[in-house]
Amino acid sequence: MIALIQRVSEASVTVDGQVTGTIGKGLLVLLGVEKEDDESKTKRLRDKVLGYRIFEDDAGKMNLNVQQAGGSVLVVSQFTLAADTKSGMRPSFSVGAAPADAERLYDYFVECCKDKDIQTETGIFAADMKVALLNDGPVTFWLQV
């Protein structure tokens, strides 16, 4: 399971002209699900995403996680993160989870975030989405479990 996380000042996702999720300060989480992923990996990635200390403390050091910084999370499904790009000029998605499995684990990731009492907004799984964000930094990390 892969999360590309970006520290943002604000972010939103729109589907068919309707905003489905919006946050202020926090993390935009682009989530990719692979074939071998399960609930255990989902919880481990949730813990890593929410615990990752990429927000500045009073001394200006990256020392706070999203909850300590008073932020929110916007989770957007992105199957292209599970692409194999090692050869050729066209990505292969053979390592990506089947759509039904990916949706189930995406939903589980969202619920796991909400269980930690953090404001969690979402896009719509497998929809054509427009994602708007204002990067803070920019600060972007690739997390994989």
From Swiss-Prot:
<dbReference type="GO" id="GO:0106026">
    <property type="term" value="F:Gly-tRNA(Ala) deacylase activity"/>
</dbReference>
<keyword id="KW-0694">RNA-binding</keyword>
<dbReference type="GO" id="GO:0005737">
    <property type="term" value="C:cytoplasm"/>
</dbReference>
<dbReference type="InterPro" id="IPR003732">
    <property type="entry name" value="Daa-tRNA_deacyls_DTD"/>
</dbReference>
<dbReference type="GO" id="GO:0043908">
    <property type="term" value="F:Ser(Gly)-tRNA(Ala) hydrolase activity"/>
</dbReference>
<comment type="function">
    <text>An aminoacyl-tRNA editing enzyme that deacylates mischarged D-aminoacyl-tRNAs. Also deacylates mischarged glycyl-tRNA(Ala), protecting cells against glycine mischarging by AlaRS. Acts via tRNA-based rather than protein-based catalysis; rejects L-amino acids rather than detecting D-amino acids in the active site. By recycling D-aminoacyl-tRNA to D-amino acids and free tRNA molecules, this enzyme counteracts the toxicity associated with the formation of D-aminoacyl-tRNA entities in vivo and helps enforce protein L-homochirality.</text>
</comment>
<dbReference type="GO" id="GO:0051500">
    <property type="term" value="F:D-tyrosyl-tRNA(Tyr) deacylase activity"/>
</dbReference>
<dbReference type="InterPro" id="IPR023509">
    <property type="entry name" value="DTD-like_sf"/>
</dbReference>
<keyword id="KW-0378">Hydrolase</keyword>
<dbReference type="GO" id="GO:0019478">
    <property type="term" value="P:D-amino acid catabolic process"/>
</dbReference>
<feature type="short sequence motif" description="Gly-cisPro motif, important for rejection of L-amino acids">
    <location>
        <begin position="137"/>
        <end position="138"/>
    </location>
</feature>
<dbReference type="Pfam" id="PF02580">
    <property type="entry name" value="Tyr_Deacylase"/>
</dbReference>
<keyword id="KW-0963">Cytoplasm</keyword>
<comment type="subunit">
    <text>Homodimer.</text>
</comment>
<keyword id="KW-0820">tRNA-binding</keyword>
<protein>
    <recommendedName>
        <fullName>D-aminoacyl-tRNA deacylase</fullName>
        <ecNumber>3.1.1.96</ecNumber>
    </recommendedName>
</protein>
<dbReference type="GO" id="GO:0000049">
    <property type="term" value="F:tRNA binding"/>
</dbReference>
<comment type="similarity">
    <text>Belongs to the DTD family.</text>
</comment>
